[in-house]
């Protein structure tokens, strides 16, 4: 049974056992574009990926299922070499406040593509991690500070979104996955915390 057949079974909930780890060649492959109309499997896969992210951010479900928290997941991380990503960034507000919207960014993207980006680069001050990497890799992961992304939804409708800050970093991380790139490829090997002129450090 293929990974997509197993994962899209009605009763299946994606867990850490479904996520492949660094060293698996699927993580280094250029994933295939999906064609429209999507297959039922491809639609269900996107929904299951989003369900996993919601479970991973729910303390009760995460503990019950042994999940690491995640804000993004790409199909290649499930050993499925397709250009499908899911992103789920919670709205962070001051303690005691309730956000109007639970999520700052919530999307299942088919064939996402960066169509333009800022000259300025940015990196998360605390570095990045990945559900497919079980070790800590310190260093600044240098990315574009702002990006414009085109993608299709499950109905084949095209969307264009402009992203900055943390949302921009998350989507770039996931698009890297469908292009066979790992986050640590973008860390300066000789000086992991090198700061070149104009680099925006996001805290």
UniProtKB/Swiss-Prot annotation:
Keywords assigned: Hydrolase, Iron, Metal-binding, Protein biosynthesis
A Pfam family that the UniProt record links to this protein: Pep_deformylase
Sample GO molecular function, one term: peptide deformylase activity
GO annotation (BP), single: translation
Cofactor: Fe(2+)
Binding site for Fe cation: 130, 173, 177
Entry's EC annotation: 3.5.1.88
Domain of life the protein comes from: Bacteria
Active site: 174
Class of this enzyme: hydrolase
Reactions accelerated catalytically: N-terminal N-formyl-L-methionyl-[peptide] + H2O = N-terminal L-methionyl-[peptide] + formate
UniProt KW Protein biosynthesis keyword: yes
Gene3D superfamilies in alphabetical order: Peptide deformylase
Family according to the record: Belongs to the polypeptide deformylase family.
Its job: Removes the formyl group from the N-terminal Met of newly synthesized proteins. Requires at least a dipeptide for an efficient rate of reaction. N-terminal L-methionine is a prerequisite for activity but the enzyme has broad specificity at other positions.
Protein name, as recorded: Peptide deformylase
Organism the protein comes from: Streptococcus pneumoniae serotype 19F (strain G54)
């Amino acid at each position: 049974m293929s990974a997509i057949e197993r994962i899209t079974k009605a009763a299946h909930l994606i867990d850490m056992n479904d996520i492949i780890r660094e060293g698996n060649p699927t993580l280094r492959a250029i994933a295939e574009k999906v064609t429209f109309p999507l297959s039922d499997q491809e639609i269900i896969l996107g929904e299951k990926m989003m369900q996993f992210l919601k479970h991973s951010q729910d303390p009760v479900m995460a503990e019950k299922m042994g999940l690491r928290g995640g804000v993004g997941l790409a199909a290649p991380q499930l050993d499925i070499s397709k250009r499908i990503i899911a992103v789920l960034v919670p709205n962070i507000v001051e303690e005691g406040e309730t956000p109007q919207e639970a999520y700052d960014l919530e999307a299942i993207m088919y064939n996402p593509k960066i169509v333009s980006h800022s000259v300025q680069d940015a990196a998360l001050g605390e570095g990045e991690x990945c559900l497919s990497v079980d070790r800590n890799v310190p260093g600044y992961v240098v990315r574009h500070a702002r990006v414009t992304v085109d993608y299709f939804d499950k109905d084949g409708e095209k969307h264009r979104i402009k992203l900055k800050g943390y949302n921009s970093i998350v989507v770039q991380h996931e698009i890297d996955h469908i292009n066979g790139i790992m986050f640590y490829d973008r860390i300066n090997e000789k000086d992991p915390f090198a700061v070149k002129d104009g680099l925006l450090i996001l805290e």
